[in-house]
Each structure stands twice: as structure tokens, then as C-alpha cells.
Amino acid sequence: METPETRFCKESKVVKTSRVFPLDTNNHNTLFGGKLMSYIDDIASISAARHCRRETVTASMDSVDFLKPIGQKDSVCLESYVTWVGTSSMEVFVKVIKEHLMTGERELAATSFLTFVALDSNGKPVPVPRVVPETEEEIMLHNTAVQRANERKNRKRHSQALANALGTDKPW
């Protein structure tokens, strides 16, 4: 197996800005959490594909932390990039910033980490390029990624044990 090349975090960077419309909101007039999660998975998948230039699958939405509500008078700006890689897996970080469109005030509204796996034409995992951080933020996220990777492995073990204990009988 050939050793993959190296890419900078910025080469996988994607930015997406959307306006919050009434149909995107819940009974609190804030953006539906599920809608934001869909935006997060979408933008993160583009970062993963840009990094490895292959088909990818979402292996895990590792964390989504909702920090501030996003209202109808806000736009929502998502920024994503690959922060760390395993052999065939990639950790993608997504930062969500809300901007009040009347005042211009910007606040960090959410953060998320996702894991993607690169696939070959047969749907099998394939090695991905190494990733090199450059900015302070990228370096900090890269340096703390091994801890998150270990937490993912532990969580996956616990999830598998839970899945083995659950039944699949019809609930009705």
C-alpha cells in the first residue's frame, strides 16, 4: 500500500452561509437542531471529499455542541476542515457562527466533530493523505485529536455492546 501524500487543513476548508427562514425554525423561533445537524453533515462531507478526493461515508457524528440559539434574524455561517486523519478515516471540525443581520454581531453558535471514511471504487476503506495544520486553531485541534479518537473508539465499543443487548422485535 502506497503512503498517501500530505495536504494542509486549509485545502479541505469549506464555508457555507445560509439565512434562517421561518420554515427552518421551531416553536421557540430558533433554528431546528436537526436542520443545523443536516447543514453540518453536508459541509463536513465536502471537506472530507476535498481532502482525500474520493467517495466518503459519515462514520460518526462524534459531537454537536449547541452553544447559542440561532434566530430568524440571524444568518448561520458554517466553516469546516479536516483536522486529523487515521489510516482511512478523517476527523472533520465544523464551527458554526451566527450573525445578527440587523446589528452585525457574530457569536459562536455551535461546534461539531465528525468522522468520515474514504472508500475505493469497491466501497472498501482506502488510505487518506496526511494532514498538516498551520493556524493556531488548526494546530490546537490537531494536537487534541488523538484524545478525541480514543474517546470515539471507547464510545464505539460501548455502542456495540449496547447494540448486542438490544432486541429487534416489533414494539407493537
UniProtKB/Swiss-Prot annotation:
Its EC number is 3.1.2.-. Residues 10-122 form the HotDog ACOT-type domain. One of its GO terms (biological process) is fatty acid catabolic process. PROSITE patterns: HOTDOG_ACOT (PS51770). It is an enzyme of class 3 (hydrolase). GO terms for cellular component: cytoplasm; cytosol. InterPro entries: Cytosol_ACT, HOTDOG_ACOT, HotDog_dom_sf, Thioestr_dom. Keywords: Hydrolase. One of its GO terms (molecular function) is long-chain fatty acyl-CoA hydrolase activity. The keyword Transit peptide does not apply. It comes from the Bacteria. Pfam families: 4HBT (PF03061). Residues 148-172 are annotated as: Disordered. Belongs to the acyl coenzyme A hydrolase family. This is Uncharacterized acyl-CoA thioester hydrolase YkhA. It comes from Bacillus subtilis (strain 168).
